[in-house]
Swiss-Prot record:
NCBIfam families: PRK01117.1 (NF002223), purA (TIGR00184). Binds 1 Mg(2+) ion per subunit. This is Adenylosuccinate synthetase. Belongs to the adenylosuccinate synthetase family. The gene is purA. GTP binds at residues 12-18, 40-42, 305, 331-333, 413-415. GO terms for molecular function: adenylosuccinate synthase activity; GTP binding; magnesium ion binding. The active site is at 13 (proton acceptor), 41 (proton donor).
Length: 430
């Protein structure tokens, strides 16, 4: 399989950035295919920390081509700010090594404002969005009124498209008792940014098709996690896009046959940001300790993550919905030193045992985890780079996870550093 798709197998924040960066050394092209700048990730390379939100991890690798696909919602100002920050850290970013789908949907300030207004008005019913305009931008895309990157190249037709967009948004704003938006200001702002954005514009589906036919290795970089998928996640506490592996095809314009190997990333425990069901959540001192050790705070938002034991039911479900061939297990070192660890092997729902997470919101809130206790390990796993360096009990824990989710571990990460990775099976050679 020449191409690899990386997806989160939990609720996001699984450590995809490090794994993608590690794999990108073997790839020619790294592609983002969904989401926006709401899903940040941190990379530590030679002691230098890089925080990415919108840009593919491939930008940190010289000689690699980074691509933002049509499935992404693209905030022009966030993009320019992120590029400037990374360039200040010595990262070279230009149209030579970064291409953006010309048909990508733009996130505008009005999307961010609407996102925040809705979330604040919802109060106790808030979903927990990042308030960065992701959902409203996807709404406009589906509603066929979005402004796309290619529209900035035609200033004759852009005003008409802005008016069509505002016919919807100004009606919403009147209902929310907010002032209407001036079309002229949006036109002026987009016109000013156009010269800085259009040099990156590309017919991405065509570019990737050419590269694939040339035999180039393509790495598809997913954002967030499969349990936040708008269809297969814990709805309505989900994101506004499809985050499962199949989106790699539609989010780039490539056919399903181009996808190849699917690598699912999951932590050795479970975390979640924001509201929504979390069967194995630990609201005690153990949960606090896991969060402290794992530095479980959002890269972009700084929000504290909820922590819990590994949920094999959920990861097994994700293996099925994403067609995952192998797992990359991260943050095993965070569990070092515990006398024992728990793994969720099933649920009880209204007194009945089940082996999946039901789709209904009420049922998801009522499921109770069934745990299996596994002996812990005292020896450190941190910075291990081979199986021989791992404690025997830690290996047993990994093997039990494989059995429970029905999928082999292909990679094991033992620290944020790129080199602290144990390779079991190379996804590009599987």
């Amino acid at each position: 399989m020449a191409n690899v798709v990386v997806v989160g197998a939990q609720w996001g924040d699984e450590g995809k950035g490090k794994i993608v960066d590690w794999l990108s050394e073997q790839a020619d092209i790294v592609v983002r295919f969904q989401g926006g700048h709401n899903a940040g990730h941190t990379l530590v390379i030679n002691g230098q920390t890089y925080k990415l939100a919108l840009l593919p991890s491939g930008v940190l690798r010289p000689s690699k081509l980074a691509v933002i696909g049509n499935g992404v919602v693209f905030d022009p100002q966030a993009f320019l700010d992120e590029v400037k920050k990374l360039q200040g850290q010595g990262v070279a970013i230009s149209p030579e090594n970064l291409r953006i789908a010309e048909n990508v949907t733009l996130i505008l300030p009005l999307h961010r404002e609407l996102d925040a207004t809705r979330e604040n008005a919802a109060k106790a019913g808030a979903i927990g969005t990042t308030q960065r305009g992701i959902g409203p931008a996807y709404e406009d895309k589906v509603g066929r009124r979005a402004i796309r990157l290619m529209d900035l190249a035609d200033l004759d037709t852009l005003p008409t498209k802005i008016e069509r967009l505002l016919a919807h948004h100004n009606a919403l704003r009147r209902g929310l008792d907010q002032p209407e938006i001036d079309a002229g200001q949006i036109l002026a702002d987009l016109s000013a940014m156009a010269p800085h954005l259009l040099p990156y514009a590309e017919s991405v589906w065509r570019l990737l098709d050419i590269k694939r036919r040339e035999g180039k290795r393509i790495l598809f970089e997913g954002a967030q996690g499969a349990l936040l998928d708008v269809d297969h996640g814990t709805y309505p506490y989900v994101t506004s896009s499809n985050t499962v592996a199949a989106q790699a095809a539609t989010g780039t314009g490539m056919g399903p046959g181009a996808v190849g190997y699917v690598l699912g990333i999951c932590k050795a425990y479970t975390t979640r940001v924001g509201a929504g069901p979390f069967p194995t959540e630990l609201t005690n001192e153990i949960g606090e300790e896991i969060g402290r050790r794992g530095k479980e705070f959002g890269v972009n938002t700084g929000r504290k993550r909820r922590c819990g034991w590994f949920d094999a039911v959920l990861v097994r479900q994700t293996v099925r919905t994403c067609g995952i061939h192998g797992l990359a297990l991260t943050k095993l070192d965070i569990l070092d030193g515990f006398d024992s660890v728990e793994v969720c092997v099933g649920y009880k729902l209204d007194g009945k045992e089940i082996d999946y997470l039901p789709a209904g919101e009420g049922a998801q809130a009522r499921v109770e985890p069934i745990y299996e206790t596994i002996e812990g390990w005292k020896e450190p796993t941190a910075n291990a780079r081979s199986w021989a360096e791992l404690p025997a009990q830690a290996i047993k824990y990994v093997r039990r996870i494989e059995e429970l989710v029905g999928c082999p571990v292909a990679l094991l990460s033992t620290s944020p550093e790129r080199e602290d990775t144990i390779l079991v099976q190379n996804p590009f050679e599987a």
